């Protein structure tokens, strides 16, 4: 996937993907940005950090813990205009629209977000396993 240089300002994103590739065997999504940064996202991580209201809630402090997604995969990745992708997971979740900004943020904060997720699972007595 490539994005034209002159479209960057139109959508208010300072980070644009140069390549988005799903590795089905590893269940990972690789996103390479024009900044030179490349992030590898496990499908499970993207699922539990979905930007959908179902996961994030409708306001601060409403984020839901999504357990049991250790083996989730991605069925489809669809472009949404020039600013995002919709990821369809094999657990049938498909309401998250991942903007370039959000994907870049997830990449930069992946370790901290993943640890927070694991901590919340443990505190709630929940598991990554289905």
Indicate residue ranges for each PLM-predicted region:
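Motif-centric detector for short Cys/His coordination patterns
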Residues: 1-130
């Amino acid at each position: 996937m490539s994005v034209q240089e002159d479209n960057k300002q139109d959508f208010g994103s300072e980070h644009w993907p140069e390549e988005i590739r799903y590795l089905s065997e590893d269940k990972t999504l690789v996103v390479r940005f024009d900044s030179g940064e490349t992030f590898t996202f496990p499908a499970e991580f993207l699922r539990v950090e979905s930007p959908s209201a179902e996961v994030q809630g409708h306001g601060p402090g409403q984020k839901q813990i999504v357990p049991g997604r250790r083996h989730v995969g991605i069925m489809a990745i669809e472009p949404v205009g020039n600013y995002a992708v919709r990821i369809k997971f094999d657990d049938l979740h498909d309401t998250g629209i991942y903007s370039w900004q959000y994907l870049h943020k997830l990449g930069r904060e992946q370790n901290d977000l993943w640890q927070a997720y694991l901590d919340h699972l443990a505190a709630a007595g929940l598991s990554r396993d289905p």
